[in-house]
Amino acid sequence: RGSHALPVISIGTEEQQKEIKKAQKYAAVGCWNTAADLFHTQTRTITDSAELWHSVGLCRAWDGDEVQAAEALHRAAQLYTDFPASVECETLAQLFDRFNTTDLIDICTYEAKVESVGRLLTLLDEQPRFLRFDVPKQTEGEAPPPVAAFQILDRPQINGPDFSQLSLDSIPKFQAHISVYDADQEAGEPASLYLTGDRGVDLEEARSLLESAAAGCISWRTDKTQPEVTGAVPAEAQPLRWTWSLPKNLPITRTRDLRNQQWKRIFSETWPNASLKALGGKSPTEAANDPRHKVALAAAIYVLDGHCQQQNHNLDLAAYLAKFGVESLPPLEVDESTQLNQLSVMQMHRLPIEKLSDPQLVSVVNRALLTRHEGFLYKALKVAFTRPACEEHMDLQRCLRAMVELCAGDGRRDEALQYVEIARGKPSQDVSQFEYQWNWDMTELALRLEDPSDPALKPLLDRFVHYYSPKVPQMRGYIEQMLSTYGVPSPWESISIVTSASASVTSAVWSPNAPAPAASPSKLWLPGE
């Protein structure tokens, strides 16, 4: 998915070129450590070749040596005079640096013996700051899961139904995690409790609260190191983490609004003022005034973009680069001979999408579906959908589904619904028409439920009751579960299922343009009516 081609190295003597070609051949057959050593040997005499250091870095990375890969790529970034190549090398180096640092926050676990699991769970369930959640069922071949799990919050959960006072500063935050296990008779282990969280004030406060709540029911183990370090997270990543505990019945639109507010705070306050090792300890705001940090700052913004993508958030990259006075990487020049499959992800994102030929665009769309950078995928699909010749060679249903997900995830519900309608008009030959329409009606239902007052929700639910329910009666429970999540009453409670006399109305396969079946005198009640 992230192809990286070794750069062309055209400098050096005839003997040096022979060694460089040998290194390239080793790299081509997967002998990356040997190739890296050969490339590195040449840097002792050709000290100022960005391409050589770039090659060393890629081979070290392919061989799994991220520390030396980062060192070589940092060096290549310093030597390149080509700004895009420099930024790409520096971006890779910073990505490798993230988890190869001593500046870490330990994830710690305390272990305690439990006198009575039943009594303990009763005590914990009574605590307003202890939020119990479901644990996965045991699967064959895996260790038994905990009998119960809790989050310890910094304040009691808000259960609504009025969430008007919920804000970024009032949302309950996660302090620690509790797992409770039954005794293991075969191993001779007693019932146990594990308390896990980031080392610091929050974890110790959670531990004190647990000791108070479960007094006489647990005892910390003295035969083991307490706490045990079970993991770590980079300290620089801490400002980008947030540990919310949102109410289960919080409307999805409100959840999305709060997430967008949090991202806005990160982009405008948190990240611009955070000290970054890649910037010599300076913050992005400070580094923006120092031309020596131009490449490193641009790379740091691309690393931030990668983090946003992991969290399903789309950063307006061009605007954010401009905010710090950094120029966007220029579009690539392409022609019919350009080997698009050899481009790195960052290079692919620089393609002039509108200028690509139809076959090139199809190739880019297929790859973008794998790499799943939301901003780039949306742009590529948007153009592809305007070209009928492209649609013939794309996995159209997958592309339409992806477009709906992109729009919905970004809060563009109306646009997502438009693509649902487009999809209905482009039936698949791989499934029956009934199944095809059912799938897209379910997609529409999920979107409509984001706003229970949507007037189009009633006729859609009527369709499920009168058309789908007689044919697939087992789907009722699933639909009702969806509705209950959004506080919408079951339509089966207020709309009569069609009788045999009206069965002819629904005997034909439903189509989007067909009139809805006649409903009984009773109607669906929705909040606000």
Protein language model regions, located:
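Alpha-helical repeat scaffolds
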Residues: 38-40, 68-76, 108, 375-386, ...
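Boundary/linker segments of alpha-helical solenoid repeat arrays
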Residues: 47-53, 78-92, 222-223, 389-398, ...
